[in-house]
Amino acid sequence: MIAMKIAECEDKGMTFGEVIDTVETYIEDQHTYFLLESLEALRKNGRLTGLKAMVATALSIKPVMGATPEGTICQLGQARGMKKALVKMADEIAAHEEHAEDKILAISHCNCPARAEELKKLLLARLQPKDVIILDTAGISSLYASDGGVIAVI
């Protein structure tokens, strides 16, 4: 998405300094949200104790997570079951986003395109972004999201 923003700036004929300022503002205004099928990655990296992960998994509790401006991960909400968690995620995104009509929504998924499409549908009922892109996770995102994980950036 950052590369797309740089290309957009170039198409507008911006100077190098203007591109830098515009892209830095764009990055500061981006928000990341995610929902994991498995809590194993959170347990392994110490963000969730083994006992909490076991109980949450047994009860099918899915935490809706987000990134803070400082780059740390925080829990925004939770729900029992993936369908309810997707609704909760869409609600959280809609509650925190201003001027969505000026932004591109990117939804990345790890082997769950139907889940990404469902999140898109839920979000389009709440927001009207400039565009929506759905893509597969890649690299380190795939490792953390694991199968069934969904990441939204707007």
Give the residues covered by each predicted segment:
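Mixed-charge interfacial surface used for oligomerization/domain docking
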Residues: 1-154
